[in-house]
Amino acid sequence: MGKEFRKPEGRPVFPKKAVITSGMPYGNKELHFGHVGGLFVHADTFARFMRDRIGAENVIFVSGTDCYGSPILEGFRKQQESGVIPANMTIHDYVEKNHKIQKDTLHAYEIKPDYYGASALYRGAEHHVESSKELFEALYERGQLKMMSTPQFYDPEFKVLLNGRQVVGKCPIEGCCSEKGYADECDLGHQYMPSELIEPKSMLSGKTPEIIEVKNWYFSLENFTDEMQEYINEVRANTNTRKYILNTIEEFLKKPVIYVQKKLIAVNPKTYTGEGAPDKDAFDAAYEAGLAELTAAFPAHEIIAEEKKPSVTFVFASLDDRDKARAALAERNINCRTGKTLVPFRLSGNIEWGVPVPECEGNKDLTFWVWPESLWAPISFTKACLEERGKDPSEWKDWWMGGDAQVYQFIGEDNIYFYGIAEMAMFAAADAEAGKPVKIDYKKLPQIIANRHILFMEKKASSSSEIKPPMAKDLLAFYTPEQLRMHFLSLGLSTKSSSFKPQIYLPENEREGVDPVLKEGNLLTNVFNRIVRSCLYTVQKYNDSVIPMGVVDEKIKAASEEAILEYERHMYNHDFHRITYVLDDYIRLLNKHYANNIKKAEEEGGEALRDQLLTDCFYGIKTALLLLHPIAPTGCETVREYVGLSEKVYDWNYAFADMKDVLANPNGETKFLPPRFDFFLRHESQLAEMQEK
């Protein structure tokens, strides 16, 4: 076995330990198709592969329900008011109910985290309070936190401070096309201060809220621009992190800017005395006068004024300078938009439902804002998982920061700012030696795997948008988990946004051809089923159900090794759609090899040719099982049982081994296969439809 597993040149190197995380769904809802198809299937497939590749004991796959935050509070309030949930239900019971439904849905999709926790529930919640305290104190002791008085929305009608999604307006970031801007972030992940939100409305009263000053803890993220740029340069040069992720991060590493429309500068009330907008002939003079006045009023800055662009860009050295310029514009009733840059990252809030912030400098009764605490929640879940394994929870550091370990975090592209910037700077700062410069070392930090949007019928669908996504569990009334897993992986979310277009959601008169959701699954339910059945029926008929142990044809062996290495490379790069291409090519090659030779063997009565064919094809089935196991585990287990293979067939130490090395029965005996047997099943609704046709 050892000599079989020699590494060819250029083969990817995997860590000895791996933590895989998947983005946490909110505790106010069930899982919709985007949660499962856009993230969880990818994370689970990679986790299953890593268990096979480096050993299950060396892999921890965690995720959980995001229990806190304004979306959960709002969901709870609305459902109680509308009578969807009982009036006496507590918010704790509310998130626990949704957590259990989420967990059941993941199980139904054969998604198997080692620990699926909840930030407010069970033992994981206890670890989460501890992790939150540890990180806060580490950052505070290293001088990375500051108490800031910042504006917050207040609804005078309801007499409450408004958080997160209790306020909706337009994102102030130049060029942003998000549907909704919330209190201090938009639904595309842009960060800004509440006072920057354009046309805010309270979700409680529907009226424009007031702004009052409140105190909160902030992490000094704005000080890490240079360190983040150095980190990005190293990640770009030394890792396989997706380039668009790095490009997205770099967009935020720019100096603070504001954009002001030229037509607004021209009517600067400090310089313009006319009525209405200046006409074309007078515009240039009015614009130049207004610009000169602003230039004198602003702190030191650079001006970018391109002739063909309708706005002027003012570039500042610091956020303070930018905000002084914004104040000067506000004094003149001139609107502006801001650009992407690093801003202080809020850690605390004032809603009661949250993880408590340690009392510090006399500030008490604060809770952590949901976004930062959800970044370290996977650490809390790792602690809980280790504890369940009988290990010391303090070993989490070996898994998250050990030299032989790697953390892989599967997220959606809208959350790159939080995971790719705020998390990296916070984790590095908390681990730094007090009083020393912070080095954001990519070798001690997670690798971010951000998928693009999964659309529904070519449109972006989410629980908070006009187009509502189908619930994940509802899809299982029409498709099997394995069919959906194959299809979701094939969508190519590593490179582009792709649309999920199940025909069952189309009117019957609009349905044409084969349902696209079934295309990849047909490789299993048609082609692979056929080759496995054919081989088993043939050994039953001619070989007393015993697999012949000959020498595998060189072409089949070479094709198998090529498929293994190509698959491994794509899995290393998290290019899941390319994995489906490898599987399609390889399994169809096996099927063609069998079909082209079995007839010849039977016509010529060639026992030797038939045995050679069976030797080749069973070796191919062994290889296909290794590659399919992370994607379609149940069907693979059924094949393994009937072919008579041990669990070594899934172990990458045996990837290039001979057939005899992975047999459950040394003599190669297979299990009797009844007629018309399927290993990979179609959904019963599909069978009924086939019978009708």
Where do the model's predicted regions map?
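Short, charge-patterned binding micro-sites
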Residues: T65-P71, G75
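Structural preference for alpha-helix termini/caps and helix-kink/transition segments
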Residues: H35, S462-S463, K468-K693
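A broadly conserved sequence feature marking short terminus-proximal activation segments
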Residues: I101-Y182, T225, Q229-A237, F252
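Basic, alpha-helical terminal appendages of large translation-related enzymes
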Residues: M1-P15, M148-F153, Q166-H190, P200-L204, ...
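Structured secondary-structure scaffolds
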Residues: G2-A56, I60-S63, C67, E130, ...
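Cys/His-rich microdomains that often coordinate metals
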Residues: L162, S178-G181, Y192-M193, T208-I211
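A charged helix-plus-loop insertion that forms the helical arch/lid used to bind
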Residues: G75-E96
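Structured alpha-helical segments in the cores of large, soluble enzyme domains
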Residues: Y94-L106, Y419
